[in-house]
């Protein structure tokens, strides 16, 4: 269990538990938007957290489910029923790809992954990816399909006005934890060709790194980013949450690169330690081949010295990788 708290007072709140991050957004006209529904056994905690922020969970207008895993949609059907029984008129969104599959892309053999009938019955609409969902001018949210964790995981870009300053802030959110068991290629157990999801996951990370420049970022799981620790330190320091986190796209780019590192690189390393052979039984060692850089010969070869490089076709240098998240002096002491 964990306490809820305001990320942007009167606009964006953390109402999840100590593992699954759930966010409640309030528009100026009172519209309430819940991002994900959490574990099926923890609904009481999420609803108490919502009440602690001054809202009635039965007043929620939109439930946005990020993908078809139980820790995201778990309480969705129960919350949907609770709102209906209270006379509420809510809309539940889910990604089409996790609900029904890839038939719309010409691949009917790739089906949806949600098998929970009450959840399937609760879904009202599907996301129109890369299209803004407008909420009264103070809130708008854009779903971005970033498959990989599942067939249809959606990430989200929020544009929210801060009621205290009237400044419009961009908040970015990566859907999905990372590469999981369903995305590992297993030639003996791969009935739906799930191997493509590993590449899709990495593509999604790169796409978000290069196309989204947020003011702040928020995670889907609290072990991806020290959300709760930062908030507790901010409370002890007596400063607002946003003052305790670094502003700008650096944190976002670094966060996405860490998802690449801890999920993919570590996975490869652990597999190699367990069995340093490829699928054909050939032992893999660093002495099997000579390492050579692309600068050694051909069009990329250059003499030593200082060069001015011009990036074309929209290319840009982002940054390197720092394994530490939210390095700041604001919480020292």
What name fits each language-model region?
Residues 225-294, 312:
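Binuclear metal-ion centers of metallo-dependent hydrolases, dominated by the metallo-beta-lactamase
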Residues 329-333:
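Contiguous, well-ordered beta-strand patches that form the walls/edges
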Residues 14, 24, 32-36, 61-65, ...:
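Structural recognition of the beta-strand scaffold that forms the well-ordered cores
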Residues 12, 41-44, 51-132:
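Active-site HxH/HxHxD metal-binding segment of metal-dependent hydrolases
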Residues 2-53, 155-181, 317-319:
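Conserved beta-strand hairpin/beta-sheet module of binuclear metal-dependent hydrolase folds
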Residues 156-180, 234, 238, 255, ...:
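Metal-dependent phosphodiesterase/nuclease catalytic metal-binding core
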Residues 38-41, 122-124, 130-231, 243, ...:
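Metallo-beta-lactamase
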Residues 1-31, 41, 275-278, 282-326:
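Zn-dependent metallo-beta-lactamase
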């Amino acid at each position: 269990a964990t306490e809820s708290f305001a990320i942007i007072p009167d606009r964006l709140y953390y109402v999840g538990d100590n593992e699954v991050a759930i966010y409640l957004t309030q528009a100026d006209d009172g519209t309430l938007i819940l991002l994900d529904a959490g574990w099926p056994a923890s609904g009481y905690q999420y609803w108490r957290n919502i009440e602690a922020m001054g809202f009635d969970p039965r007043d929620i207008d939109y439930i946005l489910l990020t993908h078809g895993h139980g820790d995201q949609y778990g309480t969705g059907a129960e919350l949907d029923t609770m709102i209906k029984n209270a006379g509420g008129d809510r809309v539940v969104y889910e990604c089409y790809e996790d609900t029904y599959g890839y038939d719309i892309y010409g691949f009917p053999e790739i089906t949806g992954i949600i098998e929970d009938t009450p959840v399937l019955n609760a879904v009202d609409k599907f996301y129109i990816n890369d299209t803004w969902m407008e909420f009264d001018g103070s809130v708008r949210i854009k779903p971005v399909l970033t498959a990989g964790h599942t067939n249809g995981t959606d990430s989200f870009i929020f544009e929210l006005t801060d009621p205290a300053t009237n400044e419009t802030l961009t908040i970015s959110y990566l859907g999905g934890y990372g590469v999981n068991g369903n995305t590992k290629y297993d030639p003996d157990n791969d009935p739906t060709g799930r191997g493509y999801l590993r590449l899709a996951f990495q593509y999604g990370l790169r796409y978000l790194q290069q196309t989204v420049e947020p003011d702040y970022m928020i995670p889907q799981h609290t072990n991806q980013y020290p959300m709760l620790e930062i908030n507790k330190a901010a409370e002890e320091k007596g400063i607002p949450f946003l003052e305790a986190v670094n502003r700008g796209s650096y944190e976002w780019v670094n966060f996405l690169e860490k998802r690449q590192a801890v999920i993919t690189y570590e996975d490869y390393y652990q597999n190699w330690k367990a069995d340093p052979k490829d699928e054909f039984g050939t032992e893999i060692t660093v002495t099997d081949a000579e390492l050579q850089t692309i600068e050694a010969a051909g069009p990329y070869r250059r003499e030593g010295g200082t060069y001015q490089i011009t990036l074309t076709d929209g290319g840009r240098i982002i940054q390197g990788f720092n394994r530490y998240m939210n390095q700041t002096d604001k919480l020292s002491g």
